[in-house]
């Protein structure tokens, strides 16, 4: 009985999913939140049940111990040795990791060094990897990188128009993110359309709290909206997305609360986007409630959000010289029909038309009309399954 855990560890959280492999059956899933803070929360879902505990969890090692003990306590596994592999989501792999890899000491050290590219994500991932290696040293640990899928971009696409020494000396370039999600939904889109992925031109829109759009040509990423860090691209839940970089020194000069570039970047990452403009929330459901109340700040935030996403999708029609399908995925992409309606409403010139009933009530699958030249699909992303598959593929190669 081979079981694999897919892990997404953040700075203060550890999200997990346990699979029976190779059957790809989900046995249990959960999340541990507020790691390092008082009143940490551990949630376990299995067999239609939900168990929640309030604990004091001081670090990721303690979180992993609690997770594993819960698996035994709730009868999900009988012993640790049933787990044969662990897969870790890592946001930034830089140019070092073009595909998923089995973890060793050198890989872990490189992931920590790459934290400069994803300071909000890589340190937590490294902590999760260390914790599992300490507690389950004999099982295979695999890293799956958000950036790997985008290493197929051409040099003229991933380089910024600044002196090349900043790339050669400091590796400043576009890396992208959400690659595992974009790869998965492109594969699923090909199945849904009944055509080989190698023949398709797709635009995949991962729209959650983080937002990224990718141009997929014959199964390869040829451009993506996130850049050197996941801050780039369209407006997001709490992130600004693209802004004029000259704003950064200007704000440091003008606002005494912003003392340096790090303060401004923190504001752009955590206090901007839907949340910053609306003053309400980063959650689209709260923004839509504000629309119903004619809240002017909610209306403004929503309009900027739609405008930025439409522009990004439009430019990828140019990159691909047309597209066979547009795919919506992730939290908002899958669950916000009003957002999808308003995005498509500004792209009808490209030959897209959605069925209003399918858009609102269909939830998953094709929501475009039969006459639509470009198919519009809603596909649930499953990054955890992608991670588990890579563990299964690599666990006998270490």
Curated annotation (Swiss-Prot):
Cellular localisation: Cytoplasm
UniProt xrefs under InterPro entries: Ac/propionate_kinase, Aliphatic_acid_kin_short-chain, Aliphatic_acid_kinase_CS, ATPase_NBD
UniProt xrefs under SUPFAM superfamilies: Actin-like ATPase domain (SSF53067)
Gene Ontology process terms (BP): acetate metabolic process; acetyl-CoA biosynthetic process
Cofactor note text: Mg(2+). Can also accept Mn(2+).
Subunit structure: Homodimer.
Annotated protein name in UniProt: Acetate kinase
Natural source organism: Streptococcus pyogenes serotype M28 (strain MGAS6180)
